[in-house]
């Protein structure tokens, strides 16, 4: 028998908590035996004194086990259960292509995703732009679509990791969100509750990233890779660039359109292609679906080129309640804004740098993102044809096209876009799309 206040005191004094103490405290979070004040106090103690790797693994697994842990054995799946998670960015539409691509190569992808908050877009919000798509299906339907189609992208159910829901809301109100240990446990507890065989983790770097510096992003990536592998899930973390919008657009329905264009081959943004292939190839390798990276990439290109990945996306949409002809006729179903108009820079030169966070906030201002949880979204608004760093910009070249519902909203977004994209006489140095892979062998 432990006392919550003694566990808090121990961590406050910089000592190491045992797995049993952590399990006791997490159980108290779930059952309300531990008060909000005590949760806040432990969060602050961890923020200042951190946790070692054993503590992080114990916290992650205790939170994972605080609710339902999905079990796929009864479905007799004939392939590995694999997934991807991103720390979030702007124009990050990867999940919509990666899930069907991995499924087309023999994997099963039960992807639990979130909604957008702040400047980052949420995968679930993109699917909410599709009429009829159920982002919160019954567990029976979720399992059926995973088995029959190979991929289902849905929201977190109430019985999955309840400890994280309570802990996170308190961290958000007590300035302890930025702890690497607590971020690691929050992300991984939800992913590991899906009983994955393998996970590819996309940790963003740059002006649109969650973490403020490359060093902080790398520290988080290493922590996630170490804890996930320590908890028994094969995991690789990739450090990927978010110094510019990842796709050529940002906004929910607009990103769905770009995802379908990617899957069908109508248009594949080269940066989006590079990061999607890097993450998806790693999933195939970790899941034993490819012998090496070249084999993985060949398989992925094949399912893109023969239409299998696009077909699976369509089956997932219809399986979860969306239109059966969505891939073929998406323009019939996706909402469109009243005003669609280009923005031009005031100077000529090269797109030199981008405040990606500000571009994400411009989408929020248009109505495409949330200022606070529960806000209603306008799925039609956002930005398209966003220039890439290094693009030559002149008086006839738009730096973006704004999709807005009013002249006032357009004017606000236009001002934000012009301020966020810096034009210079000198072209910037090219940065890689993927900075590093952190595999189990690198830890």
UniProtKB/Swiss-Prot annotation:
PROSITE patterns: THYMID_PHOSPHORYLASE
Catalysed reactions listed for this entry: thymidine + phosphate = 2-deoxy-alpha-D-ribose 1-phosphate + thymine
Keywords: Glycosyltransferase, Transferase
Keyword Flavoprotein set for record: no
InterPro entries associated with the record: Glycosyl_Trfase_fam3, Glycosyl_Trfase_fam3_N_dom, Glycosyl_Trfase_fam3_N_dom_sf, Nuc_phospho_transferase, PYNP-like_C_sf, PYNP_C, Pyrmidine_PPas_bac/euk, Pyrmidine_PPase_CS
Coiled-coil ranges per UniProt: none
Class of enzymatic activity (EC top level): transferase
MF GO annotations: 1,4-alpha-oligoglucan phosphorylase activity; thymidine phosphorylase activity
Superkingdom of the source species: Bacteria
Pathway: Pyrimidine metabolism; dTMP biosynthesis via salvage pathway; dTMP from thymine: step 1/2
Alphabetized Pfam families for the sequence: Glycos_trans_3N, Glycos_transf_3, PYNP_C
GO cellular component term of the entry, any: cytosol
PANTHER family linked to this entry: THYMIDINE PHOSPHORYLASE
Stated family: Belongs to the thymidine/pyrimidine-nucleoside phosphorylase family.
Functional summary from the UniProt entry: The enzymes which catalyze the reversible phosphorolysis of pyrimidine nucleosides are involved in the degradation of these compounds and in their utilization as carbon and energy sources, or in the rescue of pyrimidine bases for nucleotide synthesis.
Protein name: Thymidine phosphorylase
Species per Swiss-Prot/TrEMBL record: Shewanella oneidensis (strain ATCC 700550 / JCM 31522 / CIP 106686 / LMG 19005 / NCIMB 14063 / MR-1)
Gene this chain is encoded by: deoA
């Amino acid at each position: 028998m432990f006392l919550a206040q003694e566990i808090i005191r121990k961590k406050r004094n910089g000592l190491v908590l045992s797995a049993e103490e952590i399990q006791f405290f997490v159980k108290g979070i779930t059952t309300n035996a531990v008060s909000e004040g005590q949760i806040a106090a432990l969060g602050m103690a961890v923020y200042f004194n951190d946790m070692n790797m054993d503590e992080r693994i114990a916290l992650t697994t205790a939170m994972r086990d605080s609710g339902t842990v999905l079990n796929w054995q009864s479905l007799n799946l004939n392939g590995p259960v694999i997934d991807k998670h991103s720390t979030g960015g702007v124009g990050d539409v990867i999940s919509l292509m990666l899930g069907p691509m991995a499924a087309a190569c023999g994997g099963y992808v039960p992807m639990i995703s979130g909604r957008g908050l702040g400047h980052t877009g949420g995968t679930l919000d993109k699917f909410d732009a599709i009429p009829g798509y159920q982002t919160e299906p019954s567990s029976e339907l979720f399992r059926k679509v995973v088995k029959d189609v190979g991929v289902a992208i849905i929201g977190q159910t109430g019985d999955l990791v309840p400890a994280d829901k309570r802990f996170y809301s308190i961290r958000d109100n007590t300035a302890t969100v930025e702890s690497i240990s607590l971020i690691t446990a929050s992300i991984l507890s939800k992913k590991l509750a899906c009983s994955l065989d393998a996970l590819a983790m996309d940790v963003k770097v740059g002006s649109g990233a969650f973490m403020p510096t490359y060093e902080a992003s790398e520290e988080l990536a290493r922590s996630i890779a170490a804890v996930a592998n320590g908890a028994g899930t094969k995991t690789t973390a990739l450090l990927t660039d978010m110094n510019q919008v990842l796709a050529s657009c940002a906004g929910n329905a607009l990103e769905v359109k770009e995802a379908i264009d990617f899957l069908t081959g109508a248009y594949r943004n080269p940066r989006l292609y590079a990061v999607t292939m890097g993450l998806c190839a790693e999933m195939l390798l970790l899941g034993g679906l490819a012998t090496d990276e070249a084999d993985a990439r060949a398989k992925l290109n094949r399912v893109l080129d023969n239409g299998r990945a696009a077909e699976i996306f369509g089956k997932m949409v219809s399986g979860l309640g969306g239109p059966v002809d969505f891939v073929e006729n998406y323009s019939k179903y996706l909402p469109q804004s009243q005003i669609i108009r280009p923005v031009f820079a005031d100077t000529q030169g090269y797109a030199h740098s981008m405040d990606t966070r500000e571009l994400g906030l411009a989408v929020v201002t248009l109505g495409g993102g949330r200022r606070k949880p529960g806000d209603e979204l306008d799925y039609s608004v956002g930005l398209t044809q966003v220039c890439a760093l290094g693009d030559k910009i002149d008086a006839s070249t738009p730096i973006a096209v704004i999709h807005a519902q009013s002249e006032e909203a357009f004017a606000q977004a236009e001002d934000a876009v012009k301020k966020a994209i810096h034009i210079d006489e000198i072209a910037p140095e090219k940065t890689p799309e993927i900075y590093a892979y952190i595999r189990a062998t690198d830890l």
